[in-house]
Amino acid sequence: MVYSYSEKKRIRKDFGKRPQVLDIPYLLSIQLDSFKKFTDQDPTGERGLEAAFRSVFPIKSFSGNSELQYVSYKLGEPVFDVKECQIRGVTYSAPLRVKLRMVLFDREAAPGTVKDIKEQEVYMGDIPLMTENGTFVINGTERVIVSQLHRSPGVFFDHDRGKTHSSGKVLYNARIIPYRGSWLDFEFDPKDALFVRIDRRRKLPATIILRALDFSTQDILDIFFERVDFTIKKDSLVMKLLPERLRGETASYDIKDAEGNIVVEKGRRITARHIRQLEKTNTTELEVPVEYIVGKIAAQDYIDPDTGEVLVTANNEIRLEDLAQLSLAGIKDISTLYINELDHGAYISDTLRIDSTTNRLEALVEIYRMMRPGEPPTKDAAEALFQNLFFSEERYDLSKVGRMKFNRRLEIADDVGTGVLSNDDIVAVMKKIIEIRNGNDEVDDIDHLGNRRIRSVGEMAENQFRVGLVRVERAVRERLSLGDLNELMPQDLINAKPISAAVKEFFGSSQLSQFMDQNNPLSEVTHKRRISALGPGGLTRERAGFEVRDVHPTHYGRLCPIETPEGPNIGLINSLATFARTNSYGFLETPYRKVVDGVVTDDVEYLSAIEEGRYVIAQANIELDGEGRILEEQVACRHKGESTFMRASDIQYMDVSPQQIISVAASLIPFLEHDDANRALMGANMQRQAVPTLRSEKPLVGTGIERALAVDSGVVVAAKRGGVIDYVDASRIVVKVNEDELRPGEAGIDIYNLTKYTRSNQNTCINQRPCCQVGDPIVRGDVLADGPSTDLGDLALGQNMRVAFMPWNGYNFEDSILISERVVQDDRFTTIHIQELSCIARDTKLGSEEITADIPNVGESALSKLDESGIVYIGAEVKGGDILVGKVTPKGETQLTPEEKLLRAIFGEKASDVKDSSLRVPNSVTGTVIDVQVFTRDGVEKDKRAIEIEEMHIAQARKDLSEEFKILEEGVLSRARNLLLAGGYTQAQLDAIPRKELLTQVIDDETKQTELEQLAEQHEELKADFDKKFEHKRRKITQGDDLAPGVLKIVKVYLAVKRTIQPGDKMAGRHGNKGVISKICPIEDMPYDEQGNPVDIVLNPLGVPSRMNIGQVLEVHMGAAAKGIGNRIQAMLEEQREVAELRGYIKQAYDLGETQQKVDIESFTDEEVIRLAKHLKDGLPTATPAFDGAKEKEIKQMLELAGLPTSGQLRLFDGRTGNAFEREVTVGYMYMLKLNHLVDDKMHARSTGSYSLVTQQPLGGKAQFGGQRFGEMEVWALEAYGAAYTLQEMLTVKSDDVNGRTQMYKNIVDGNHQMQPGMPESFNVLLKEIRSLGINIELDQE
């Protein structure tokens, strides 16, 4: 493999055995592609905004004299960029402008004659835009729209598993689910009649639907039944025979063949042998006794030709006397329905008997009564209702997916049918459910991923937009009918409010629009790749059973079987597998390599769950030779959802990668194959809660996916084009682009601005640091700057800690963790948290609130950190209770005492009519002010601080732009110099020419002269562009802010809080091994090895066997080896050994094991080897991909290379006594994470605080500054101890005895430590509740 300059800084040793056929796809594509389809112009009009417009427009007036047509739309430019939106707290969106055409028709002339056409662009609200990382900024916060897994439209057949009826009989049902519109269900009842329900309402006999579609009884019988024909002879009947129909029946008479031989005697069972005999003798007729036809059902009406009297009606049983009448009337041929108990049930025939309707109108009225109970039906209303239910394109749409699923299930050609149902469709569904009831077909598996599809952002936004448009449509139709159309323009008809309201509601408060989990890059990526079965149109937690939550064979390679939350949502919220993607229908598909005649090719094909079932698919770990031929005779593979063994020649596809089945979070766990699945689930979930540490450190034992994840997450800065680093500082990187990657006529400079110390959604700190130096050559995709939790472009969620597995004085009982003081001193797990505190000045009834440093009754010391505007300085260190922003609120007029009046008269009246409502630091917080933002309403005078901040921003913008201009100008001038040199100037002449005049020189060569003139033009353009950009920025900075009604000013203060690790914080490894820190132990007391090096962390060995996450032990061994190799390299560097020796050792490390990774260290220059060695001295980073990782043998080889015992165990000594422990201890390096469950956020104690209004008991919870509940069981405990006085105190003065507790404060102040318990308030509440039942209880107080 060829490594770029940056990649050569640090190469991860990969233990993967299989070559990578397919790179990990871009991880956020599910979000970005979906939204792109929504906003991009689609000429076919099948999706996105275009589809929504085309489905609603044209809107015709009721009279048909005018219509409003849609022409095209365009999205404008957003006013603010993403960062500005986050700071100002507004939505990142673009205005939608739609070109509409209003057409008026001439009433007098022929229909369709156009009288007038008006075209106009109309504003239709703002559409939130997706940022390049797949998120939305709504009201200043980043949100993610989670994709939904819902039941695909189409037709589904199912049964109730015998649960509905007490007999345990299985009742089948069919359901037609449209994309939008009414559901149509068919179901059997215990008596085997078929019923229909519309929208899950009251059931009707299914034949009512057929009658409503204008089928007669005769038509219905002909569609659903075959016939048996009889001819009447004198005293017997002759039946037309199809021998196959007799199978399984018991003969009620002797059955003779065509030659008159008895084939089956009376009372015997007819078998396949008998049927073969009858077929052999070519028997086509059979004489049967007259009684045989009695009880059979007539297939049609029989009418006396002379009198016209109906002798036998269709679907009725034939009696003996009917036969006599038919003979008399001269009717010789009779047909009956072919029915048998086994596989031709009489279901429709029975249903017709229940059906009370006889014609179309009665059926329509019956349906109308069921849908609209209580309304009197009219013929037109009934017809319109039924027509609108399933046959109107406005009200019903199966969608492309639904039609495809419907046709495939009913074996109809794919191109037949539209978005609405046809008569044939309904008949086909009824035929299929009868076929299933007859046992000739199977029911569907609704948890199969071929029956569930993904609805992503774009599609959901389109649906919401359409909802808004439909609301507008009604209003437009009314306005078209009412007003004088000659005067109106399209914009007078359209009100954009309903549209923006629908869109806003979806992005702001839909269940699937979630506050982005921004703890670290992994949690961002997994949140965007999440697939939820909950949400509108999905399941609910309470109703979801086990089957839906379970892992299904079709999840293979599509949804991760590991990563799902614990708790009530388990299995309902899933994560997309690493390589999965959605196809055009919204079904998940996964890639496979094609296998031809036992040879694996490199052709990759994506298969959906439906297609996959047809093929035989082998796993990724089968043995292949050099040509890709499968070596094993019998190969483990999957076919039709089952795992089997098959011959190599039968294999049609094979997996692309062993990591194919798991999600990104699970594939970050090394040695995943050695962990129990439950613990792996916890490991995957806990990595998402890791807090970014102060100094990120790459994992020594990784899986090789860390880099792809960090780059795709968007937290690092990756180079857009190759070039050379021209300038680097903490907030900006400038790259001079390579000549071959330039677009014509551009300056060839890329500028990357870095994000510095901003706050994430979870209050962690987002900060980018450059990881390149001036002069470094870079290629496209190289990482230029690290973000939070990344280290040289690798994801780095935690720290490599030296771990020993041993008990230590009970301090690691029950998963507790003992850590060394050194971890705290070195700031290994120190994290920075940024809190945003805001102070709002409002306009109140009594006057407006004011932000000022002049606060009543506050001492000088409290104001020491404020400036003259009353706002805290940047850099001030503040603690709980300090004032950040001084604010006073007008107080209502109160009756003044004469003394106060006198004081007012003397000192002026300002001080007493305002009260202090300043923003203070919350109690448990101490930190440093790192930023202050002031937002002022338009038209309100800006204070001094706001103007200062504005000027600072303007200066910053000017500096940024002028530096950018300088760099671009330099690019132009350097090209001009090159031209002049080529045109005959000498270097000395060039040096003498002032910069400004370079572009005005004259060259003899005409082409060069024109090039120089072009450069001069470009320079002018740059100048103009600079002025324009600066003016635009200045205008943006100085304009007033659009604040909520009644708000005059908002001041936001950002505090940075530094949190070191301390007892009570939660830590975890990557294998679900979590624990809480119990003690921070002095370095000298920690166990140490023979070299005197103490360990960092002591974990309990009992946490491993019962939990079966052995991966952590292997990780520790591998980590020890990696660190040991790093130590050896460091020693070589310190001893300044020959580069050749260093190169040899590094080569040995990379070549170890049977891996497919080949690092050609020989091709590296000496400088590159030394630079690589400097990055490896902290440990050789290794990668063991899931299911394809390092084997035990390789770990031992690594330990040998590091010069460590292959047991992985060392002799340790007790730090307190100096004695060796009695047996060797497993010591190595484990990657530990600090999780976002910090004791500082949870610790809470109440002195006195607020009380609940009704019960007068203290509130609960940290947010309310609440107390600890002394509950029922705690009362029992005190009763058991007989602690009567303590109990009385708990139930009265410490809780809800209002008078008692105020009296107690007074007593404490007076130094009298006694209490007088009174009546608890909750007793009075109980009395009131009993009175509300009408029972009067009064308390006689003595």
From Swiss-Prot:
Q: What class of enzyme is it?
A: transferase
Which Pfam families does this one have?
A: RNA_pol_Rpb2_1, RNA_pol_Rpb2_2, RNA_pol_Rpb2_3, RNA_pol_Rpb2_45, RNA_pol_Rpb2_6, RNA_pol_Rpb2_7
Q: Which domain of life is it from?
A: Bacteria
Keyword list (alphabetical) reads: DNA-directed RNA polymerase, Nucleotidyltransferase, Transcription, Transferase
Q: Name one GO molecular function term.
A: DNA binding
- InterPro entries for the chain: DNA-dir_RNA_pol_bsu_ext_1_sf (IPR042107), DNA-dir_RNA_pol_bsu_external_1 (IPR019462), DNA-dir_RNA_pol_su2 (IPR015712), DNA-dir_RNAP_su2_dom (IPR007120), DNA-dir_RNAP_su2_hyb_sf (IPR037033), RNA_pol_bsu_bac (IPR010243), RNA_pol_bsu_CS (IPR007121), RNA_pol_bsu_protrusion (IPR007644)
> What CDD domains does the entry give?
RNA_pol_B_RPB2
Catalytic function, reaction form: RNA(n) + a ribonucleoside 5'-triphosphate = RNA(n+1) + diphosphate
Q: Has keyword Ribosomal protein?
A: no
Gene Ontology cellular-component terms for this entry are: DNA-directed RNA polymerase complex
SUPFAM superfamilies hit by this protein: beta and beta-prime subunits of DNA dependent RNA-polymerase (SSF64484)
Q: What is its EC number?
A: 2.7.7.6
Provide a GO biological process annotation. DNA-templated transcription
Which family does the entry's similarity section mention? Belongs to the RNA polymerase beta chain family.
| Subunit relationships | The RNAP catalytic core consists of 2 alpha, 1 beta, 1 beta' and 1 omega subunit. When a sigma factor is associated with the core the holoenzyme is formed, which can initiate transcription.
Instruction: Tell me the PANTHER family matching this sequence.
Output: DNA-DIRECTED RNA POLYMERASE I SUBUNIT 2 (PTHR20856)
In UniProt terms, what function does this protein have? DNA-dependent RNA polymerase catalyzes the transcription of DNA into RNA using the four ribonucleoside triphosphates as substrates.
Q: What is this protein called?
A: DNA-directed RNA polymerase subunit beta
